[in-house]
């Protein structure tokens, strides 16, 4: 189980790296799906299946809509692939920044290779998922308001970008 959780963590980091290097929106969607599935699987292994399911539905549902808009706007006849030198350079630069930041910040010294799962506590482990909805609405009200405001702002930004030059502030002279 530990190796599987570490594999999910590696897939999460590689999926995030694939989204961050962003050679083309076509390939960014693949990285987004890999990172989302791996992250939700990681949360599932920690015992928070309700949070994992909610994040999976909301994140993939919302972000794939944004990627569909960006794919429809960026109609490249020859999109850049992950094998291009520029994209490989971006990926290597991101990995280098992560490694240097970990060494300088001292995170490498405190990292222990063990992963604690939900079943490691024996019979008396309390699963965090039993109070999932109650915790969302009691302790997470402020975060819900911030996330809702951010999603509303993102919706208006995407709608403004998709609208184009029809009635926007940028006009032809």
Swiss-Prot record:
<keyword id="KW-0812">Transmembrane</keyword>
<comment type="function">
    <text>Core subunit of the mitochondrial membrane respiratory chain NADH dehydrogenase (Complex I) that is believed to belong to the minimal assembly required for catalysis. Complex I functions in the transfer of electrons from NADH to the respiratory chain. The immediate electron acceptor for the enzyme is believed to be ubiquinone.</text>
</comment>
<protein>
    <recommendedName>
        <fullName>NADH-ubiquinone oxidoreductase chain 6</fullName>
        <ecNumber>7.1.1.2</ecNumber>
    </recommendedName>
</protein>
<keyword id="KW-0679">Respiratory chain</keyword>
<keyword id="KW-0520">NAD</keyword>
<feature type="transmembrane region" description="Helical">
    <location>
        <begin position="48"/>
        <end position="68"/>
    </location>
</feature>
<keyword id="KW-0249">Electron transport</keyword>
<keyword id="KW-1133">Transmembrane helix</keyword>
<dbReference type="GO" id="GO:0008137">
    <property type="term" value="F:NADH dehydrogenase (ubiquinone) activity"/>
</dbReference>
<feature type="transmembrane region" description="Helical">
    <location>
        <begin position="87"/>
        <end position="107"/>
    </location>
</feature>
<dbReference type="Pfam" id="PF00499">
    <property type="entry name" value="Oxidored_q3"/>
</dbReference>
<keyword id="KW-0813">Transport</keyword>
<keyword id="KW-0496">Mitochondrion</keyword>
<keyword id="KW-1278">Translocase</keyword>
<dbReference type="InterPro" id="IPR050269">
    <property type="entry name" value="ComplexI_Subunit6"/>
</dbReference>
<keyword id="KW-0830">Ubiquinone</keyword>
<feature type="transmembrane region" description="Helical">
    <location>
        <begin position="139"/>
        <end position="159"/>
    </location>
</feature>
<keyword id="KW-0472">Membrane</keyword>
<feature type="transmembrane region" description="Helical">
    <location>
        <begin position="1"/>
        <end position="21"/>
    </location>
</feature>
<dbReference type="InterPro" id="IPR042106">
    <property type="entry name" value="Nuo/plastoQ_OxRdtase_6_NuoJ"/>
</dbReference>
<dbReference type="GO" id="GO:0031966">
    <property type="term" value="C:mitochondrial membrane"/>
</dbReference>
<dbReference type="InterPro" id="IPR001457">
    <property type="entry name" value="NADH_UbQ/plastoQ_OxRdtase_su6"/>
</dbReference>
<feature type="transmembrane region" description="Helical">
    <location>
        <begin position="27"/>
        <end position="47"/>
    </location>
</feature>
<comment type="similarity">
    <text>Belongs to the complex I subunit 6 family.</text>
</comment>
């Amino acid at each position: 189980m530990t190796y599987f959780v570490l594999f999910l963590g590696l897939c999460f980091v590689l999926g995030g790296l694939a989204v961050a290097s962003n050679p083309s929106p076509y390939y960014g969607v693949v990285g987004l799906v890999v990172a989302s599935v791996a992250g939700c699987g990681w949360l599932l292994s920690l015992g928070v299946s309700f949070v994992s399911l909610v994040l999976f539905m909301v994140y993939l549902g919302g972000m794939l809509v944004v990627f569909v808009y960006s794919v429809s706007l960026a109609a490249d006849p020859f999109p850049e692939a992950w094998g291009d030198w520029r994209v490989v350079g971006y990926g290597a630069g991101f990995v280098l920044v992560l490694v240097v930041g970990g060494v300088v910040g001292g995170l490498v010294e405190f990292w222990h290779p063990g992963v604690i799962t939900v079943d490691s506590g024996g019979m008396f482990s309390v699963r965090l998922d039993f109070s999932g909805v109650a915790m969302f609405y009691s302790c997470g009200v402020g975060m819900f308001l911030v996330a809702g405001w951010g999603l509303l702002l993102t919706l208006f930004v995407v709608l403004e970008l998709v609208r184009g030059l029809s009635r926007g502030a940028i006009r032809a002279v």
